[in-house]
Design a protein with these regions (language model features):
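FAD-binding core of flavoproteins
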Residues: 1-74, 78, 88, 182-199
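Structured core elements
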Residues: 1-2, 11, 28, 60, ...
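Conserved catalytic-core motifs characterized by acidic clusters
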Residues: 13, 37-54, 79-93, 117, ...
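Extended, low-aromatic, Leu/Ala- and acidic/polar-enriched alpha-helical coiled-coil segments
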Residues: 63, 94-104, 133-136, 141
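C-terminal helix-coil-helix/basic helical segment that borders enzyme active sites and/or dimer interfaces
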Residues: 77, 81-88, 104-138, 151-159
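Alpha-helix capping/hinge segments and adjacent helical runs
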Residues: 126, 130-199
């Protein structure tokens, strides 16, 4: 149902303060009357519509994760190029190079999974459950590791409250929770793989 904000009985309860890149709040429905014309889809088909919507939303969460990971990688690269330790740029140390290479490789793989899910949806696939679950799972888990590695590359600067990577570190964690936790994505993926037709 689409419920207009001025509907009698619809009440804003409170804002939720959380580590996420967007606002969240709690609302209450107290004896709200909503006309049938505001119904989305057919009666009795809401759950199926909700699941189909999750297919699309999970891919967008994966895309958001890729964006955060890309920014974290950019910050780590900039720091590795300009920060000097023991008389040379931080980026010349092999352990830092290994982190940067791994971050970039995993980000590219995550992007490809997100693109695959988006492409399938754009091509009109009825369901993209498997593609979007894989994209969300891999991209959010990868983004968490990439942001963590970026904090490590930046060292003390990475944990300053004013640091971009510190803000990303606090925000990226929520992506592994909403639109289905990582654990739920594992169940969705395995369940589909175990079906004979994979759908």
């Amino acid at each position: 149902m689409v419920v207009p904000a001025d509907t009698p009985g619809l009440r804003f309860v409170r804002s939720q303060v959380l580590s996420a890149p967007h606002p969240l709040g709690e609302i209450a429905f107290e004896s709200c009357r909503v006309p049938a014309a505001n119904r989305l889809g057919e009666e009795g088909k809401g759950f199926a519509l909700g699941l189909k919507t999750l297919d699309r939303l999970r891919a967008t969460v994966g895309a958001a994760a890729c964006g955060m990971a890309a920014r974290a990688l950019a910050e780590a690269l900039a720091h590795a190029r300009t920060r000097r330790q023991f008389g040379k740029p931080l980026g010349e140390f092999q352990l830092v190079q290994e982190k940067l290479a791994r971050m970039a490789t995993h980000l590219t793989a995550a992007r490809l999974l997100v693109y695959r899910a988006a492409h399938a949806a754009d091509e009109g696939a009825e369901r993209v459950t498997l593609e979007s679950a894989m994209a969300k799972l891999h991209a959010t888990e990868t983004a968490q590791r990439i942001v963590d590695d970026a904090v490590q590359v930046l060292g003390g600067k990475g944990v300053l409250a004013s640091s971009v990577v510190d803000r990303l570190y606090r925000s990226v964690r929520a992506l592994r929770i909403y639109e289905g936790t990582s654990e739920v994505q594992h169940l969705v993926i395995a369940g589909l793989l175990l079906k004979e037709d994979g759908r």
